């Protein structure tokens, strides 16, 4: 009898592992936050360079950041979102702009 129970326990463990492995990854919103100093052209550049938007869509998002205080640049897995936030913030600092990029769970 012990063997049967062991197999049932093993089957349950495998089933639990598969269920966990098949869960979609957590997603995160990458957000640009408005400030009074970063030029609009720089924000457009960031949106094109790091999020691959064309100039028209980048301009629309830049205006959303400007008038609404922030805008979602995209929704990504945790690792991708963290990397994009880090790269945008580093690029802004290298260019001496206070532009802030953050993330939050979607």
Swiss-Prot record:
The record's section on Pfam families has: ClpS (PF02617)
Q: What Gene Ontology biological process does one annotation of this record name?
A: protein catabolic process
User: What InterPro entries has UniProt attached to this entry?
Assistant: ClpS, ClpS_core, Ribosomal_bL12_C/ClpS-like
- How does this chain assemble? Binds to the N-terminal domain of the chaperone ClpA.
- Can you tell me which family this protein belongs to? Belongs to the ClpS family.
Q: Give a short account of what the protein does.
A: Involved in the modulation of the specificity of the ClpAP-mediated ATP-dependent protein degradation.
Spell out the protein name for this chain: ATP-dependent Clp protease adapter protein ClpS
